[in-house]
Regions:
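Non-catalytic scaffold segments within catalytic domains of secreted glycoside hydrolases
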Residues: 1-116
C-alpha cells in the first residue's frame, strides 16, 4: 500500500456510539494502540480525529446516537464530560499510552470513570 499511496495515514471520524459510556474508553485505547502499531510498521500518521467531541445529529437516527466525549443535554444545552474523556485526555496529553492505563482498561471490570 505504501508504494501506491505513500506512508501518510489520516484517521477521521473514528468513534463509537455508546450512550452509557461503557465501552468508549476501551475503544479509544484500542484505536490509539493501533495507531502506535502503524507507526512501528513504518506508517506516518498525520492526524487522528475522534468522532465526536459532543453528541450530535446523525441523519438516520437523529439525536439517538451518542458519539460524543461530552454529553449534551438537548433541553438546557449543558455539556458534561463522559468518564471516557479521562482516558482520551491521558493519551493525548502524554502523546503516549501509559502501560498502567492499558492494563486498567483492558483488564478492569470497573466503569471507565473509575479507572483514573
Amino acid at each position: 500500500m505504501a508504494s501506491k499511496y505513500s506512508n501518510a495515514l489520516y484517521v477521521t471520524e473514528n468513534g463509537t456510539s455508546d450512550p452509557r459510556d461503557l465501552n468508549r474508553a476501551s475503544y479509544i485505547l484500542s484505536h490509539a494502540y493501533a495507531m502506535l502499531k502503524a507507526i512501528e510498521s513504518g506508517l506516518t500518521p498525520r492526524g487522528y480525529f475522534h468522532w465526536s467531541i459532543n453528541d450530535n445529529y446523525e441523519w438516520p437516527q437523529g439525536f439517538k446516537q451518542k458519539f460524543g466525549l461530552f454529553e449534551v443535554d438537548l433541553i438546557t444545552k449543558e455539556r458534561k464530560p463522559r468518564p471516557s474523556t479521562k482516558v482520551f485526555k491521558e493519551i493525548t496529553s502524554r502523546n503516549a499510552i501509559n502501560g498502567d492505563l492499558l492494563k486498567l482498561v483492558v483488564f478492569s471490570e470497573k466503569p471507565p470513570g473509575e479507572l483514573i
